[in-house]
Amino acid sequence: MIFSTLEHILIHISFSVVSIVITIYFLTLLVDEIVGLYDSSDKGMIVTFFCITGLLAARWIYSGHFPLSNLYESLIFLSWSFSIIHMVCYFNKKHKNNLNAITGPSAILTQGFATSGLLNKMSQSVILVPALQSQWLMMHVSMMVLGYAALLCGSLLSVALLVITFRKVIRIFGKSNNFLNESFSFGKIQYMNERSNILLNTSFLSSRNYYRYQLIQQLDHWSYRIISLGFIFLTIGILSGAVWANEAWGSYWNWDPKETWAFITWTIFAIYLHIRTNINLGGINSAIVASMGFLIIWICYFGVNLLGIGLHSYGSFTLT
């Protein structure tokens, strides 16, 4: 009873803190001068991490098994994974940490859905079904969820890269059309005025374009690093799941919906890594593949559970 109460307290604290973190972070986007706000948002994510860690530990103690037996517990663990990814990047002092825009909303959305009325039955701790009573539960599911979290963060960074890049292309294309449609009937005086304005604005435009270029490079860099980490976790999760499946069902691979979509997810991000490491194909092409992977992950992690079929149906739920 004590641990159950502690779990409810911690989940509400973590949800409240991460909500404040998101608000603070978006305020820093509007007011860059307030450095203290930015630092407090990072500290808020650290508080969130420890709250969710305590929540998972409390649930582990009173349930008697690692809290990854259903969708509710995996969503809480996914939220914890988002916070730990943020902390790893936060303690890397070489680069300014801009991941709050990704990890903060991701954590609050996963926690919000986990604590919604849809998963009330799953929030109650129950005895594990025989298929889950194995030491492989912690290894397989934790690696898969950590992989999902890292791949989701990296994919969202790629989406941001595409938005910034294509916004720039559209703006340039629009300016080019306006330039072609301009009339030159105003003569030499207008030409000299335009030339003067261009010279005055050159330094401003150059600095703005340089900042955009730096931002795109950072997004590509962090997306590649985080997706690479997530790909490793996903690979370990799939391999450990195959070993567990052989022990439980007598076969390493059965092509049920969850396994099939896990393989599709792995293939998509293998293609991403191949394109990203190819000098002639990297950049926009790899970001497009990663953006596709974002949708594939949610189908694999969440969408397949709606079917309620296959060997992984014990983790499913219905929307009725």
UniProtKB/Swiss-Prot annotation:
Q: Where in the cell is it found?
A: Plastid, Chloroplast thylakoid membrane
Keyword Cytoplasm present in the record's keywords: the answer is no
One family name in Pfam for this protein: Cytochrom_C_asm
Q: What is the protein's membrane topology class? A: Multi-pass membrane protein
A Gene Ontology cellular component where this protein is annotated is: plasma membrane
Keyword Protein biosynthesis found: no
Q: Which residue ranges run through the membrane?
A: 9-29, 44-64, 71-91, 99-119, 144-164, 226-246, 261-281, 287-307
Q: Which domain of life is it from?
A: Eukaryota
Keyword vocabulary terms for this entry: Chloroplast, Cytochrome c-type biogenesis, Membrane, Plastid, Thylakoid, Transmembrane, Transmembrane helix
**Cross-referenced InterPro entries, in alphabetical order?**
Cyt_c_assembly, Cyt_c_biogenesis_CcsA, Cyt_c_biogenesis_CcsA/CcmC
Q: Name one GO molecular function term.
A: heme binding
Where does the signal sequence lie? none
Q: Which GO terms describe its biological process?
A: cytochrome complex assembly
Q: What is its main location?
A: plastid
Task: Please describe what this protein does.
Answer: Required during biogenesis of c-type cytochromes (cytochrome c6 and cytochrome f) at the step of heme attachment.
**UniProt xrefs under HAMAP family:** CytC_CcsA
What is known about its subunit structure?
A: May interact with Ccs1.
What family does this chain come from, according to its entry?
Belongs to the CcmF/CycK/Ccl1/NrfE/CcsA family.
Q: Tell me the protein's name.
A: Cytochrome c biogenesis protein CcsA
Which gene specifies this protein's sequence? ccsA
